[in-house]
Amino acid sequence: MRALLARLLLCVLVVSDSKGSNELHQVPSNCDCLNGGTCVSNKYFSNIHWCNCPKKFGGQHCEIDKSKTCYEGNGHFYRGKASTDTMGRPCLPWNSATVLQQTYHAHRSDALQLGLGKHNYCRNPDNRRRPWCYVQVGLKLLVQECMVHDCADGKKPSSPPEELKFQCGQKTLRPRFKIIGGEFTTIENQPWFAAIYRRHRGGSVTYVCGGSLISPCWVISATHCFIDYPKKEDYIVYLGRSRLNSNTQGEMKFEVENLILHKDYSADTLAHHNDIALLKIRSKEGRCAQPSRTIQTICLPSMYNDPQFGTSCEITGFGKENSTDYLYPEQLKMTVVKLISHRECQQPHYYGSEVTTKMLCAADPQWKTDSCQGDSGGPLVCSLQGRMTLTGIVSWGRGCALKDKPGVYTRVSHFLPWIRSHTKEENGLAL
């Protein structure tokens, strides 16, 4: 009750002082005032201190720049008053009960330095691409970029951007064809990558394989990932996910409505034949995938049209770095390999006749990096006629990054009739 009375009294004093009262006194007490603000008190209540801010600043500590209408750089030091996302939805206050359960909120010890407080203004405390905020959409709490423009652009956004559309093979980051040894990456680098998990009876979920989004409702993967557990109800699919066991901003979760395994799939001692599968995905709300910066389709090649041997291509997944590793890495990883000719891959010291014309071989020329256990079903993506194209599906190989033992991939260009016959939506495919 005393605290409430003190606050009410403080409000009265502040209003009085703003109307011309000369009862304010600067005090040496530390109010953590920023931007030239001074710590003051009223002579009648000297134990109550607050920040007296310069004209263009506001907030408890003068931390809000009321004149700032754009952000510089990535907006890490933006302290303006933008408070809606790019769709015009209001941001949640950083001190709201929902936000207090997240990583960044007003009660952090470094909240003042990060610009967080008892307000809902957009900030960028973790050095993302631009200022963002938390937005409540139904029962979901989303991290959304804000409706505030870059000072370098010289203009304000007059309205929310047009609805995004799927454009196969397009990503926000440029292709990286000079990686040696692989590197950890984010989903923006491979926005078509799908992470496939299997449910267990006890309720736990484990990662199974990768896949690629070829149309809003269809993910392509490898049959050998599902052959032992072919029930569609056993699987869930995530798009837009950068980490194996934790959520990523903007990710989408899907049930598997239909699981199609190639009827002519077979496995020898080492090789997998016709190793291709299709998963029709649907969210609990009945929707297919929605395009975003982190979710995009990959282009399919034209019939029997593959890049030249020696072409550098990207592979992505949560696979192990070595076949002896016990755990999968937590962060998505990407590496670059080069396509190897069939003639070379069919040499006896490679794989001999186990490699067929429905397969492709690819490896790091130094044999330092490769697809490995856990990468199965994931994409081998090459630039073809200016578009990132799904050239192969991770299938099999001996060990990981062993000399003369390249990774072997399902040759997607040889399976287009099969893909079309089962999806029955050729116009929706990323051709």
Swiss-Prot record:
The active site is at residues 224, 275, 376. Residues 70-151 form the Kringle domain. GO terms for cellular component: cell surface; external side of plasma membrane; extracellular exosome; extracellular region; extracellular space; focal adhesion; plasma membrane; protein complex involved in cell-matrix adhesion. It catalyses: Specific cleavage of Arg-|-Val bond in plasminogen to form plasmin. The lineage of its organism: Eukaryota, Metazoa, Chordata, Craniata, Vertebrata. Expressed in the prostate gland and prostate cancers. Specifically cleaves the zymogen plasminogen to form the active enzyme plasmin. The gene is PLAU. Belongs to the peptidase S1 family. It is an enzyme of class 3 (hydrolase). Residues 152-177 are annotated as: Connecting peptide. Glycans are attached at residues 38, 322. Inhibited by SERPINA5. Inhibited by SERPINE1. GO terms for biological process: blood coagulation; chemotaxis; fibrinolysis; negative regulation of fibrinolysis; negative regulation of plasminogen activation; plasminogen activation; positive regulation of cell migration; proteolysis. It is linked to Quebec platelet disorder: An autosomal dominant bleeding disorder due to a gain-of-function defect in fibrinolysis. Although affected individuals do not exhibit systemic fibrinolysis, they show delayed onset bleeding after challenge, such as surgery. The hallmark of the disorder is markedly increased PLAU levels within platelets, which causes intraplatelet plasmin generation and secondary degradation of alpha-granule proteins. Transmembrane segments: none annotated. Its EC number is 3.4.21.73. It comes from the Eukaryota. GO terms for molecular function: serine-type endopeptidase activity. Residues 34-57 are annotated as: Binds urokinase plasminogen activator surface receptor. Residues 1-20 form the signal peptide. This is Urokinase-type plasminogen activator. Pfam families: Kringle, Trypsin. It is found in: Secreted. The modification Phosphoserine is found at residues 158, 323.
